[in-house]
Structures are given as C-alpha cells and as structure tokens.
C-alpha cells in the first residue's frame, strides 16, 4: 500500500486478554473506495440534540461514528446519517458521499438508506449546520 493509492491499515491491538482488530483509514476516500460501502454508524449525537462543546450547534440530522475505522484525527470515523427523520441510536446504511475538509484533518462520511441518493446541494443543505465552518468539498 502506498500513500497515493490509499488503503486500509489493519492492526491488532491487545487489551488485556482481548485482541481487537482496528482498521485505520489512510487516504482511502481519495480514491472513492468507501463510497458504496455498507457501514454501521453508532449515533452519539442524535437528531434534535446540541453539540457537547459548542452549544450553538444543533444537530438537524443524526451524527455518529463507524466503530473500528480510525480517521486521520485519531478518532473513529465520523458520519452524518441522511434520510432518517427521527433520533436513532445506531444505523446501518450505505456511504453515499464523502465530505472532504480542506482546512481540517477530518473527512466526514455521509450515510443513507440503501437505494436513497442526494445531490451535493441537498447534502450540503442538511450538513451546513456544522460544515459551514469549514472549507469543504462533497465527493459522490
């Protein structure tokens, strides 16, 4: 694997007697490999809640992370869930887009129900509550 083609680095970490497999994303979204993948999102900021540190940011969509996929910021990969209009605790769906931040180390995945699609404009309208603070590009 090289940095230009991207890929996933698989690691095994040992926690006590337990072995945990962790995938670390390395420039993978640059080549669009994740778009179309089915993922499970654990929702830690349900629709209708506020950001834990920035109380003026209201979550108009469900937002969470994909377990065991580590993003470049060292945290699990963040994801917006579109098309679900009620708060949920977790969600299994398809990655339909990647939001690339030019002024941050993070990329956000956009996940939706199988067979549902959104235009770049529709995605930005739904995630602008948070993405308005960054220089971003949506990749479909």
Language-model segment annotations:
Residues 1-4:
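Short, low-complexity, charge-dense intrinsically disordered segments
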Residues 8-10, 67:
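Intrinsic-disorder/low-complexity coil detector
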Residues 22-140:
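Hydrophobic N-terminal alpha-helices or hydrophobic patches in metabolic proteins across all domains
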């Amino acid at each position: 694997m090289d940095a230009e083609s991207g890929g996933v680095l698989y690691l095994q970490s040992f926690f006590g007697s337990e072995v945990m497999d962790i995938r670390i994303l390395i420039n993978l979204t640059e080549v669009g490999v994740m778009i179309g993948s089915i993922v499970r999102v654990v929702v830690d900021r349900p629709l209708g809640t506020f950001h834990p540190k920035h109380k003026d940011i209201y979550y108009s969509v469900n937002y969470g992370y994909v377990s065991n996929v580590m993003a470049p910021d060292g945290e699990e990969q963040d994801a917006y869930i579109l098309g679900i209009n009620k708060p949920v605790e977790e969600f299994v769906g398809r990655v339909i887009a990647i939001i690339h931040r030019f002024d941050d180390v993070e990329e956000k995945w956009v996940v939706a129900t199988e067979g549902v699609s959104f235009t770049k404009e529709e995605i930005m309208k739904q995630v602008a509550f948070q993405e308005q603070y960054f220089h971003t590009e949506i990749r479909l």
